[in-house]
């Protein structure tokens, strides 16, 4: 199955949910194995979900935004997965069009999005990199 075949029978929200759950499960397995890796198993027939979820390839910006929100909701209580989605897909999408940062800020009433913002802000503050970039409250 590929992206368009999946979307012919499933929703963008379902794609995001599956991406989030797969990411969470890989992080948990890597943590249990103490090896730190989160690389998808190339033999997995659904590994395309990981690629599409991570980089949004084949999705419009609006579609990718929906997928990311659903992924965040699917992992709302998992700090590692929330951080990975923030540092990966959310940053990737804003890199495609920086106006989308405003859309993410507008979704901060959603607990999963707010949690991702908190984690990314903590991370960026710890880097002492001179600011939070689009993650900052002043960007909203």
Task: Report each predicted region and the residues it spans.
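Alpha-helical solenoid scaffolds in large eukaryotic transport, assembly, and signaling factors
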Residues: 2-136
């Amino acid at each position: 199955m590929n992206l368009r075949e999946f979307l012919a029978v499933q929703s963008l929200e379902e794609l995001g949910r599956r991406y989030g759950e797969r990411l969470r499960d890989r992080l948990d397995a890597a943590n249990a194995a103490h090896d730190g890796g989160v690389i998808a198993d190339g033999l997995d027939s659904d590994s395309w979900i990981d690629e599409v979820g991570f980089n949004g390839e084949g999705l419009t910006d609006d579609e990718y935004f929906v997928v990311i929100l659903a992924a965040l909701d699917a992992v709302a209580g998992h700090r590692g997965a929330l951080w990975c989605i923030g540092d990966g897909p959310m940053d990737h999408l804003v890199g495609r069009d920086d106006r989308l940062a405003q859309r993410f800020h507008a979704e901060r009433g959603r607990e999963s999005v707010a949690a991702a913002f908190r984690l990314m802000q903590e991370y960026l503050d710890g880097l002492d990199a001179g600011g939070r970039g689009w993650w900052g409250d002043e960007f909203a």
